[in-house]
């Protein structure tokens, strides 16, 4: 006899009629026929069955909270389902960490959330954004969350690991480590940024070198300009201290002007000689008066054309004085060339004038004179010389105006 089966007490048999009075104790009978049937055939009895999934554990709270977080349409600007509804995307990790994680979890660390996804087998779909997917994490199919299992990790190296099936191994091979994959992408991005920064640094260094060289050239030019300015101021100060300097320049200028006038007169003599020849030829031939008159008119026109407008091309007295100061030694050689051009009966007289002019220039304005004049004024103080410079300018202006009036 099976001890699990017991007699069932029949409290309300079929023949018992309802009555307002409670039944007596003798009315409770045991059905012997039912007991015998249960003993003979136990399958005829119906056992109470548990509800489906009663002994199964539900999905982990992490997956449930994550699903509710993604399903909420009010936070689609931060996290939402993808277009294919088989993955979810975190659009704003900063806002996700600050606002949503503390609401559903006990932390606000986005990296911890990603590591937790990794332990449940989520994979990162797109390396350029935070998009995660799992075969059991689908939109509108929350009941599939129970199929997602947490990976078992053992810290004890001596613990025996259970062998996995070929299917599970293939799934693990295709599964991407989410946290590590994200770190690799960030490292690649940092390497690219480093390379770009290195190229920019090299370009800036080259630009700095070129700018430094340019500034060095500018400084050298500025120093040369300042030295020339100091020499000019020293020269002007020295000229103001030497009252005979201006007088010597004026006398030298007058002598040069006399020599130029003498040279211009001597150049006109061949033209005058030709005129006399025409007149003589006219006297001998008998009809030369008309020819002489016409030739004299032509000669006068040519002289007027040649020498009449020389004043337009003459330099001002101040310009000549400046040129004379800058290159007085070169003027003597130029004068020699001009004087050597003159040929004729007066060649000896011109050479004597040239030698006297050259001798006077060497005596008065030799190389030693200019060198001493510049060297003596190198350390001169220019603070109180503004009045002397103004006087020099007035004297130079007086010389220019007097030359034009003459």
Swiss-Prot record:
SMART domains: HSF. InterPro entries: HSF_DNA-bd, WH-like_DNA-bd_sf, WH_DNA-bd_sf. A motif (Bipartite nuclear localization signal) lies at residues 253-269. Residues 174-240 are annotated as: Hydrophobic repeat HR-A/B. Residues 266-279 have a biased composition (Basic and acidic residues). It is found in: Cytoplasm; Nucleus. Residues 266-287 are annotated as: Disordered. A motif (AHA) lies at residues 367-376. A motif (Nuclear export signal) lies at residues 392-399. GO terms for cellular component: cytoplasm; nucleus. Keywords: Activator, Cytoplasm, DNA-binding, Nucleus, Phosphoprotein, Stress response, Transcription, Transcription regulation. Transcriptional activator that specifically binds DNA sequence 5'-AGAAnnTTCT-3' known as heat shock promoter elements (HSE). Belongs to the HSF family. Class A subfamily. The hydrophobic-rich region (HR-A/B) corresponds to the oligomerization domain. AHA motif is a transcriptional activator element. This is Heat stress transcription factor A-6b.
């Amino acid at each position: 006899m099976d001890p699990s089966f017991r007699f069932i007490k029949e409290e309300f048999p079929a023949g018992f009629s309802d009555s307002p009075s409670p039944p007596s104790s003798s009315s409770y009978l045991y059905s012997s026929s039912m007991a015998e049937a249960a003993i003979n055939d136990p399958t005829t009895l119906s056992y109470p069955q548990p509800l489906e999934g009663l002994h199964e554990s539900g999905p982990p709270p992490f997956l449930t909270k994550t699903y509710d977080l993604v399903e909420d349409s009010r936070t689609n600007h931060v996290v939402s389902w993808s277009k294919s509804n088989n993955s979810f995307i975190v659009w704003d990790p900063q806002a996700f960490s600050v606002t949503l994680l503390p609401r559903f979890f006990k932390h606000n660390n986005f990296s911890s959330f990603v590591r937790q996804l990794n332990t449940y087998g989520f994979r990162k779909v797109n390396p350029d954004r935070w998009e995660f997917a799992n075969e059991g994490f689908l939109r509108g199919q929350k009941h599939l969350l129970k199929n997602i299992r947490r990976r078992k990790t053992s810290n004890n190296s001596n613990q025996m690991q259970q062998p996995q099936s070929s299917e599970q191994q293939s799934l693990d091979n295709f599964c991407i480590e989410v946290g590590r994959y994200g770190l690799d992408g960030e490292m690649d991005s940092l390497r690219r940024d480093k390379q770009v920064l290195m190229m920019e640094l090299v370009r800036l260094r080259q630009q700095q070198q070129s700018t430094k060289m340019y500034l060095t050239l500018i400084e050298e030019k500025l120093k040369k300009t300042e030295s020339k300015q100091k020499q000019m101021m020293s020269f002007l100060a020295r000229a103001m201290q030497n009252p005979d300097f201006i007088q010597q320049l004026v006398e030298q200028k007058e002598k040069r002007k006399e020599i130029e006038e003498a040279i211009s007169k001597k150049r006109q003599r061949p033209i005058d000689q030709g005129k006399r020849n025409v007149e003589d030829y006219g006297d001998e031939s008998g009809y030369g008066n008309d020819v002489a008159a016409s030739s004299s008119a032509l000669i006068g026109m040519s002289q007027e054309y040649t020498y009449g407008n020389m004043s337009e091309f003459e330099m001002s007295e101040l310009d000549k004085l400046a040129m004379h100061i800058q290159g007085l030694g070169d003027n003597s050689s130029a004068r020699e060339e001009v004087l050597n051009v003159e040929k004729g009966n007066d060649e000896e007289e011109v050479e004597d004038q040239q030698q006297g002019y050259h001798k006077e220039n060497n005596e008065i304005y030799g190389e030693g004179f200019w060198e001493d004049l510049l060297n003596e004024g190198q350390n001169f103080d220019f603070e109180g010389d503004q009045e002397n410079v103004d006087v020099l300018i007035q004297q130079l202006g007086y010389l220019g105006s007097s030359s034009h009036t003459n």
